Amino acid sequence: MTIENEALTLKKRFRGYFPVVVDVETAGFNAQTDALLEICAVTLRMDEEGVLHPASTIHFHIEPFEGANLEKEALEFNGIRDPFSPLRGAVSEQEALKEIYKLIRKEQKASDCSRAIMVAHNAAFDLSFVNAANERCKLKRVPFHPFATFDTATLSGLAYGQTVLAKACKTAGMEFDNREAHSALYDTQKTAELFCGIVNKWKALGGWPLVNEE
């Protein structure tokens, strides 16, 4: 691989990190006490031209952990009326996370990256719930960096002057259906599209590859 082609790889672009877009829906704001109810992850790939695209999607509804707090306002906000309904097809936190991590490790290895890094809108929130679930499930091999993230709320504020996901997407020229919002699946797909758009726009403006990098 030439130096020029190497600069257009996922590994080179993010310094060995493998970005994975994540969104969670929860039963409150406290990661230690409130239930994690839904999670989606979208992996990314970089084509031969150095353009970033969404790749694989994995999505789960999750059973509230034993003793979890369920805030009524949060359930009304995300539309999960009955977290215990069998119609949700929910699985345990452990099952969901293990399957997500299995996919991440496979694609991370294929990209020759050393570690996954979470991409999310207001990423500290999503990472806090994932980290809390990791602790509850006593998961030892977690692919994500424990605190580093790419936050699309911050990035879209810089790129488009908007920090709300729906407004950032619309300003970027993307379609956004507010009726679908607050579903982890839909929000993750839109966050992935937004992140790829920002990265690709920066490249198109001449910001990558770095001209002075040896």
Swiss-Prot record:
A cellular component term, taken from the record's GO annotations: cytosol
Coiled-coil portions: none
E.C. number(s) listed in UniProt: 3.1.13.-
Catalytic residues in the record: H182 (proton donor/acceptor)
InterPro entries, alphabetized: Exonuclease_RNaseT/DNA_pol3, RNase_T, RNaseH-like_sf, RNaseH_sf
Residues that hold Mg(2+) 1 according to the record: D23
Stored SMART domains: EXOIII (SM00479)
Family, as annotated: Belongs to the RNase T family.
Self-association state and partner proteins as the record states: Homodimer.
Name this protein carries in UniProt: Ribonuclease T
